[in-house]
Design a protein with these regions (language model features):
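Lipid deacylating catalytic domains
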Residues: 2-117, 121-219
Length: 219
């Protein structure tokens, strides 16, 4: 490939990522007026009985997960609770508020555990909760574009990154034990990209054969 062709290919990739980010931003902007609708959906009728707690990023809000929620609902995951917080960087303090929120969700649903999905700083909040007081209350943790600051992440965490995320690049030099990188995806795109959403579904809902094997082992 010539230098000119290589540069053209590189700029093409940048343009596609930028378009994806703009599309993600547009979808979130359109969902913003709906922020008071469906923030908490804890129906007892669900193929996936584990409640899913959604934690947005520092400048986000619960509507950021609008596309993700619709995608999960199509795959039988319909019990959601959105955790919102005021913008600040003290994720340890936010984690204490998340602990209270999850305790309320568990009490309201009679569930023993929750799944947590956090975007950006929201992933840090969820991870800190699991690593401190919430290990036994969180079945699975999904972090999207979350800074990786430790040598080890929780055993139940799936860390998802965008290859073209300028804010939180994938930590290839110290990769988490369970990491997925979505090619050509940026920071906001992790909330809307179909490949990222499918990755989350597969992690929260293992294949039927895996569930049957787990049941056989438990028996």
């Amino acid at each position: 490939m010539t230098d000119d062709a290589s540069k053209a290919w590189s700029w093409s990739g940048v343009a596609m990522t930028a378009a994806g980010e703009l599309a993600a931003f547009a979808q979130m902007a359109c969902a913003f007026p709906l922020r008071r609708l469906g923030a908490h959906t804890l129906s007892d009728v669900d193929d996936h009985p584990v409640p899913v707690v959604l934690v947005h990023g520092i400048l986000g809000d619960p509507t950021n997960f609008f596309v993700l929620r619709r995608h999960l609902a199509r795959h039988g995951i319909r019990r959601f609770s959105s955790f919102a917080y005021r913008p600040r960087l003290d994720y340890q303090r936010i984690s204490r508020d998340l602990e209270s929120h999850i305790a309320h969700v568990l009490t309201s649903t009679d569930a023993g555990q929750v799944d947590v999905i956090g975007h950006s700083l929201g992933g840090l909040v969820g991870r800190y909760f699991v690593q401190t007081t919430g290990k036994h209350f969180v079945r699975r943790l999904v972090t999207l574009g979350t800074p990786y600051l430790a040598l080890h992440n929780p055993a139940q965490e799936l860390a998802v990154f965008g290859s073209d995320d300028a804010l939180v690049p994938p930590p290839y030099d110290r990769a988490p034990r369970r990491m997925r990188v979505i090619e050509g995806c940026g920071h906001l795109g992790l909330l809307t990209d179909g490949r990222a959403l499918d990755t989350i579904v597969r992690y929260l809902r293992p294949p039927m054969w895996a569930a049957n094997r787990a049941a056989d082992v438990a028996a």
